[in-house]
Amino acid sequence: MRLKTLATHPVWREPRTVFGVWMLTGVIFAIVKLLIGKYNNYKIFEGVYWHAIEGLTLYGDHYPEYYDSNHYGVLFSLIIAPFALLPEWLGMILWIAGNTALLFYAISRLPLSSTPKIIIYWYSYCELMTAQGVQQFNISVAAFILLSFVLILEKKDFWAAGIIMLGTFIKIYPIVGLAFFFFSRQKVRLLVSCLFWGLVCFVIPVLYTPGIEYVISQYIDWFERLKVKNMLNMFADRSEEH
């Protein structure tokens, strides 16, 4: 009876409670993975930054630094940079926490009342834990898609385009945000903004990597790597996908 009372307590319907549970789970997963030494995805992620500034291929074999291959675009090196520059244990904890907080914020922005949002928070919690456990960036990918939808509804197409292009240049999948084109009341502005932000996202890595030739070569290698990945996906363990 006490367990039932606890499970139905109003505190679980408070957004701050959900946020606390989400963040606590992320920190616990990070600490456990650090202690047992199983955080290969994060090693790949931080490696993207160091390899980019050193002008090394982002998609080759970097064993024993880590196993498996990177599947993220050159721009990802900028996103992971603040975490890669920190001590590994701190960077990984903040990485998981940051991704988690972004998804929580994105859901909070949906044009829904409190109750549906709480349902979404708890319904997605199990999948969130899986992603936290393997340090996936997919948490933020989901956030990008949600935020692009919200911003388009709010007639902030310029910023929606920025999020769509940022996500696309990092991991392709957020390009599905363009499906929200039909919800836009500023369609031309959205398309022009996508072109602008696409150019910005392409140029930014040139500023801190060896140069434009390196960036172009890495984008070519990235597309080739994605082709291989797509062929293998049907046989892959999706829980380990990064």
Predicted features along the sequence, with ranges:
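Membrane-interface alpha helices of multi-pass inner-membrane proteins
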Residues: 158-182
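Primarily membrane-embedded glycan-assembly and transfer machineries that use lipid-linked glycans
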Residues: 2-159, 184-241
